[in-house]
Amino acid sequence: MKHKRSDKVAETIHTTISTILSRGLNDPRIGFVTITGVEVTDDLHLARIFFTVIGDEAAKKSSEAGLNSAARFIRHELGKVLKMRYTPDILFKYDHSQEYGQRIDDLLREVGTGNDGNDSEDR
């Protein structure tokens, strides 16, 4: 299976931004952030970076605001690594998939505990 160029660029962006965040940005709004995924458009002009953060809703919003305000610096650092004619614009978005997955797990557990073990009688 062939990989699109945008997939390779997304992988490079993912590792580079993870490295930048591990070194730390000088913004107190940014909490403990984990990059969960990167989507790059086929024309390589926009990169959506999905992240999660430990904390409440206020921590999520402040981290997203901090990351988006640091996007210009991060884009500059990406330009050094990517060595492309045009470095993609960056947009940080909170990744709700973990919360969604947790909700599904909770519902499955709830259904499982609602079962009183009388399955053998129904057969």
Curated annotation (Swiss-Prot):
Protein name: Ribosome-binding factor A
Organism, as annotated: Trichlorobacter lovleyi (strain ATCC BAA-1151 / DSM 17278 / SZ)
SUPFAM superfamilies in UniProt: Ribosome-binding factor A, RbfA (SSF89919)
UniProt key word Cell division: no
Assembly description: Monomer. Binds 30S ribosomal subunits, but not 50S ribosomal subunits or 70S ribosomes.
UniProt entry tagged with the keyword Transport: no
Gene (UniProt): rbfA
Keywords: Cytoplasm, Ribosome biogenesis
Species lineage: Bacteria, Pseudomonadati, Thermodesulfobacteriota, Desulfuromonadia, Geobacterales
Biological processes, Gene Ontology terms: maturation of SSU-rRNA
Entry-linked Pfam families: RBFA (PF02033)
One annotated GO molecular function: ribosomal small subunit binding
Function according to Swiss-Prot or TrEMBL: One of several proteins that assist in the late maturation steps of the functional core of the 30S ribosomal subunit. Associates with free 30S ribosomal subunits (but not with 30S subunits that are part of 70S ribosomes or polysomes). Required for efficient processing of 16S rRNA. May interact with the 5'-terminal helix region of 16S rRNA.
